[in-house]
Amino acid sequence: MVLPQRHRLRGRGVFDYIYQRGQRFQQGLLQLRVADAATNLLREPPETLEGELRFGVVISSKVSKRAVKRNRLRRLLHEAFLRQTFRSDLPPTWLLLNLRPGAVELSDDNLLEEWSTLIQRAGLTDS
């Protein structure tokens, strides 16, 4: 499942903003940074941002030298993001997920369990 354009984080300025201003949460081999959306950093600001979430995944070559494995992890996490039910009262928010070395050895179920725990810890879900 491909992450729709309206949910993608793109551009160096956006990533730098999240690294500098984002609140950091960690669970196992996953690290999530959560920042309020800064629409001035987007190339084409959308007309309405109510409840808009944008998501990016960073997987360095230290996690796996093989791009095939990194891309599989990225697709798995994009799908988990799209299937996740987030709080309805969230302001426009940007999420940036970093995977640490060793994440490629986790089973898909363990990785998704860590993702679920991480977003609950960040207060992004109702449960």
UniProtKB/Swiss-Prot annotation:
Molecular function terms in GO for this entry? 3'-tRNA processing endoribonuclease activity; ribonuclease P activity; tRNA binding
Q: What is its EC number?
A: 3.1.26.5
Recorded hits in SUPFAM superfamilies, A to Z, give: Ribosomal protein S5 domain 2-like
Q: Name the InterPro entries on file.
A: Ribosomal_Su5_D2-typ_SF (IPR020568), Ribsml_uS5_D2-typ_fold_subgr (IPR014721), RNase_P (IPR000100)
Q: Where is the signal peptide?
A: none
Q: Which enzyme type, at the first EC level?
A: hydrolase
Q: What is the superkingdom listed in this entry's lineage?
A: Bacteria
GO biological process entries:
tRNA 5'-leader removal
Recite the UniProt keywords alphabetically. Endonuclease, Hydrolase, Nuclease, RNA-binding, tRNA processing
The reaction(s) catalysed by this protein are:
Endonucleolytic cleavage of RNA, removing 5'-extranucleotides from tRNA precursor
Which family does the record assign?
A: Belongs to the RnpA family.
The record's subunit annotation is: Consists of a catalytic RNA component (M1 or rnpB) and a protein subunit.
PANTHER family per the UniProt record, alphabetical:
RIBONUCLEASE P PROTEIN COMPONENT
As for what it does, the entry says: RNaseP catalyzes the removal of the 5'-leader sequence from pre-tRNA to produce the mature 5'-terminus. It can also cleave other RNA substrates such as 4.5S RNA. The protein component plays an auxiliary but essential role in vivo by binding to the 5'-leader sequence and broadening the substrate specificity of the ribozyme.
Q: What is this protein called?
A: Ribonuclease P protein component
Q: From which organism does this entry originate?
A: Synechococcus sp. (strain RCC307)
